[in-house]
Amino acid sequence: VSDEYRPQVALFDAESGELIHRIVPEESDYNAISYEPGRGDVPEFTKATLPEVYLERRGSRGFEALAYNSDDGLLYAFIQTPMSVGGDSSSSTVRRILAMDPITGEPQHEYMFSQIGPSNQDKIGDAVYDPERGAFLVIDRDNGDTVAANKSILRMDLSDATDTLGYDWEALLGDGVYAPELLENPAAVAEAFAEGDIVEVDQVELLNLPSLPGVDPRFDKPEGLALKPDGTLVVGFDNDFAR
């Protein structure tokens, strides 16, 4: 289970429902809040193994999507929106996908992709792995509730993308520039990626949900995605308990 509010993944026992462990970034600090006994930073079930930079996600914009890749046995966590690296949520359009071993919690791969929709279409909703095509199907949405809204289903192919896990960004971008999110604009990112031979995730928009017959555009938060054995996509909408 991924945590949309922070960069965290929790593994539960399917039969008992008990927490086995949770996976969080290195240097995660829970001391600012007084937790009840058994909560907070409990070493027995906390694996602080993910890259520290993920602590710099925007508030409430953590791992919104999580998908299991049945081909390599890894979990792929998708940051919902561009991170606030350096404390600045600015105009970055760079987002990240982090692959991790669900048992050890160790990160295995990381991939970058830039937003391809309008500026307000900046929220990953959910993702699912398609083993027939070796790619991920991903919801990327805005907050609109009309037929003109953008709630795309994207196909994301990671096969040719550069693995940036552990990448020395300062060597490419300069002293103190430790992440591409710190660059001024998308053009600067594209230039830097070209210089560093960094290939982003290949993205193709398959469809836009509000344009489909029978889809009520007032359901503005598609945040669940599943793939049936026959290839049918099932989309779930979150209404935040609205009635």
Q: What does each of the following model-derived ranges do?
A:
Residues 1-243:
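Sequence/structural signature of beta-propeller domains
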